[in-house]
Amino acid sequence: MILEHHFASLGHAFSSKTHVQPLIEQRLVEFNQSLASFLSIDIKSTETKCILSGEEALPYSLSMVYAGHQFGGFSPQLGDGRGVLLGEVRGQDGLLYDLHMKGAGPTPYSRRGDGRAVLRSCIREYLASEAMTALSVPSSRALALYDSREAVYRETPEAGAMLLRVAQGHIRFGHFEYFFYQGKQAELDQLIEYCLEHYYPECLATDSPLESMLTEVVKRTARMIAKWQAIGFQHGVMNTDNFSFTGETIDYGPYGFMEDYEPDWVCNHSDHEGRYAFSRQPGVGLWNLNCLMRCFSKHLERDQLIAILQCYEPELQTHYDSLMMSKMGLTSTQDVHELLPALFTILAAEKMDYTVFFRLLSHYEQGEFAFLLDEVIDRERLLAWLERYEVARDKGGLLWSQASASMLAVNPKFILRNYLAHEAIVAAEQGDYLPFRRLLNVLTHPFGEHSESESLAQRAPEWGKSLEVSCSS
């Protein structure tokens, strides 16, 4: 494994030298071999094993400093309070990827915290990041999970753990906010050049590299959120310090995958105002991008920044329309626009499971209404919608069998339901990782039938519907 240290070369203004502090009696309990192969990482190597686990102190490992708007309020200095960037490795695609350890121990930015993570949160992030990747959502990845015999104190004592994460970059909107509001123009310029060189090199050849890069950041963010909305994912804490400059989903905390369709659903129990509700995510994405654009007010004219931001909504809408068109087996965005509002009204009124409905729709054969109508109380309303849907689907010119096959490839049978994560966590805390691995297997292959794992596709039982997650998750 060849570990590079490009971010460290930026200097002390951007980070602090920090070593991973291994946990008491830590052990490797899950390793992502396919991701490791892509990154040319050999876990059988003793040296590599010691580097990845933090048992070997690295000369250039670091924790990053940044700022951020948290629930609308600005925090001038945040930073990696429990994370350490080990360095970067090159993937088989020739790109560099960060290796970042969560739960690595205290850093200069821990703000009186212990810098640790608990097994519960590490399992949730491992499952979510791999599930999102399988659903074609840009996301950080999970490379390795370590548990331990070290107690970490939250509301109650919990098992300490560490998660080794992989992403194209860990630079956040908040990195730019930190230097802008500190008035550190030279460092801000340095960060801009770094991002152009490492993440957006294609923009260097344009007439206005910064303008081109920011336009691409806006579009990537729009496409990412469009995918969140299409699969029913809610991030939970859409602060600017949790938004990636490379357009990846990062920092999985009190997230959730929608079960009963509820547009104003709030998955984070700590979000008392519903600021980051499911239906508000597209608007929050634009708000965060507006915060980011302010940081370049000395580089570009106001009209240029506004024009860049105006790319967001059409990019999000176009991508969302395309995704929903595929989910519904249609070929016309006009049909999507005409059918979707009425469908969402039905799903909300019936408290229909979002994922289950679209999977059932994928199996729908022309004129065979019964199995779908059995899912609802108001059969006449759904029947009227299905009749309109049939007309739209016929217009596409595809055979119904072809359309169904395409729909089954984009409508998952398996999502990460909160109660399933809870069951996997409870078992793992007792030393049994089999439920975690069974769940991980279907989440990384969510479109298959997996008849032997049918129970993992079931809707939440009553006890599972009352589970809550918060920022401590």
Swiss-Prot record:
Keyword terms, alphabetized: ATP-binding, Magnesium, Manganese, Metal-binding, Nucleotide-binding, Nucleotidyltransferase, Transferase
One Pfam family here: SelO
Cofactor: Mg(2+); Mn(2+)
InterPro entries assigned to the protein according to its UniProt record, in alphabetical order: SelO
Disulfide bond positions: none
EC number of the protein: 2.7.7.-, 2.7.7.108
Record keyword Metal-binding present: yes
UniProt keyword Plastid, yes or no: no
Binding site residues for Mg(2+): N242, D251
Residue numbers annotated as active site: D241 (proton acceptor)
Catalytic activity line of the entry: L-seryl-[protein] + ATP = 3-O-(5'-adenylyl)-L-seryl-[protein] + diphosphate; L-threonyl-[protein] + ATP = 3-O-(5'-adenylyl)-L-threonyl-[protein] + diphosphate; L-tyrosyl-[protein] + ATP = O-(5'-adenylyl)-L-tyrosyl-[protein] + diphosphate; L-histidyl-[protein] + UTP = N(tele)-(5'-uridylyl)-L-histidyl-[protein] + diphosphate
Stretch forming the signal peptide: none
Function: Nucleotidyltransferase involved in the post-translational modification of proteins. It can catalyze the addition of adenosine monophosphate (AMP) or uridine monophosphate (UMP) to a protein, resulting in modifications known as AMPylation and UMPylation.
Protein name from the UniProt record: Protein nucleotidyltransferase YdiU
Native species: Marinomonas sp. (strain MWYL1)
Name of the gene: ydiU
